[in-house]
Amino acid sequence: MSKKPAALIILDGFGLRNETVGNAVALAKKPNFDRYWNQYPHQTLTASGEAVGLPEGQMGNSEVGHLNIGAGRIVYQSLTRVNVAIREGEFERNQTFLDAISNAKENNKALHLFGLLSDGGVHSHINHLFALLKLAKKEGLTKVYIHGFLDGRDVGPQTAKTYINQLNDQIKEIGVGEIASISGRYYSMDRDKRWDRVEKAYRAMAYGEGPSYRSALDVVDDSYANGIYDEFVIPSVITKENGEPVAKIQDGDSVIFYNFRPDRAIQISNTFTNKDFRDFDRGENYPKNLYFVCLTHFSETVDGYVAFKPINLDNTVGEVLSQHGLKQLRIAETEKYPHVTFFMSGGREAEFPGEERILINSPKVATYDLKPEMSAYEVKDALVKEIEADKHDAIILNFANPDMVGHSGMVEPTIKAIEAVDECLGEVVDAILAKGGHAIITADHGNADILITESGEPHTAHTTNPVPVIVTKEGITLREGGILGDLAPTLLDLLGVEKPKEMTGTSLIQK
């Protein structure tokens, strides 16, 4: 019996905008895409910012896009998750934070807050520190100390004073907190097992050892005078009038490490929490029994509490298809294979029962502008064969070209990439339609739609432009205002499968 497959076709990096200059999507001849756009119901989807769980205005990417598509819901990335928690009041009700504060209050101990002191948004955000200071004040703490790690990488190399001034203003306004130590991230956030660096940061925080200054701004001024900028500032101790350190991390104190990205938070956390730590000698009087809180899950090796626990993505599209006994195919070339498999399945490597995967090797060229068609024709040939063999109920396909060639910032090769994809798209969709099936044609984020900056330079990054969605089924209407998280419910809708409660996205097909 002939299967009537429903396919989700992702044209990676295929964004939409009206302006044609530097817009390979608009400049390319794409008769098949245009035919489907004109013949079938279509809309645009938001694929950036909070609609995909990123901060407002931030461009999407392939990992985030495929996570949202497969999950059928907005998957909040750590930064946005914490921002939303602050905005909606969940942050100050977070039990892990409250327990750390109770430990300090009930045992007359200090609360130490440490993390990267910037608004770079890659490892941390200074607003999260301010929210912790407000919470500490609200809960009546007085002994609150900040150990600031200077950035200079995710923000400008000499911006530390801006952030220290912001922090000093907040301390004054909120009425709690003192800066106890300052160190460049080169020391406190090493991830390459350069323990001599980590030890310097540790000794400043735990023992009050290192160069000493009366204020954080003095540390920076002195460093700059010696040609040492933010990232590389030597771990330094802030002292009181009598020359004693403002604070040292001591036995039984509470610590909240407000970085959200794990990789550069693990080593310094292990130094404070791991009973079997052997990478350098912490000394006899190292602080023990700390109530140590990580903002997110850093590592199994870190012996601490986690404020924002990992979100397990249950009932992604692949799992739901499998539960209903439907056969599914995931197909892409090497560059986007992890996206249609691992990310589409919510971070799961293993196949679901009834899932088949086809990997087509990407061409071995230095850069893809040298071969803009990449392996699109091979992907198409393999898929058409599968469709004709009536094996699959659902197909998830990615064409990598608009994104991978778009990253070159070169208009002509990207036009060629899109024209190759359009040719393949026509054969694939027509094969599906010939079987009585349906296709959803869409994208995960923009890229090929802006290849030239306003100043005429090559534009190699993703864009925040909307992406298309076409459903090749006549007699239906698609609603406006859709997001990537609505695609899985739409695919299930085409297959007559009810979406699970975990999928908070809704089908784009109007009822």
Swiss-Prot record:
Enzyme kind, highest EC tier: isomerase
Matching Pfam families: iPGM_N, Metalloenzyme
Role: Essential for rapid growth and for sporulation. Catalyzes the interconversion of 2-phosphoglycerate and 3-phosphoglycerate.
Pathway this chain belongs to: Carbohydrate degradation; glycolysis; pyruvate from D-glyceraldehyde 3-phosphate: step 3/5
Gene field: gpmI
The family this protein is said to belong to: Belongs to the BPG-independent phosphoglycerate mutase family.
Top-level taxon: Bacteria
Residues involved in substrate binding: H123, R153, D154, R185, R191, R261, P262, D263, R264, K336
GO biological process, one term: glycolytic process
Family annotation (Gene3D superfamilies): Alkaline Phosphatase, subunit A, BPG-independent phosphoglycerate mutase, domain B
Residue positions binding Mn(2+) 1: D403, H407, H462
Residues annotated to bind Mn(2+) 2: D12, S62, D444, H445
Subunit architecture: Monomer.
Annotated Gene Ontology cellular component terms: cytosol
UniProt protein name: 2,3-bisphosphoglycerate-independent phosphoglycerate mutase
Cofactor stoichiometry and binding remark: Binds 2 manganese ions per subunit.
HAMAP family the record matches: GpmI
Activity regulation: Inhibited during sporulation by acidification of the forespore, thus allowing accumulation of the spore's large depot of 3-phosphoglyceric acid.
Cofactor dependence: Mn(2+)
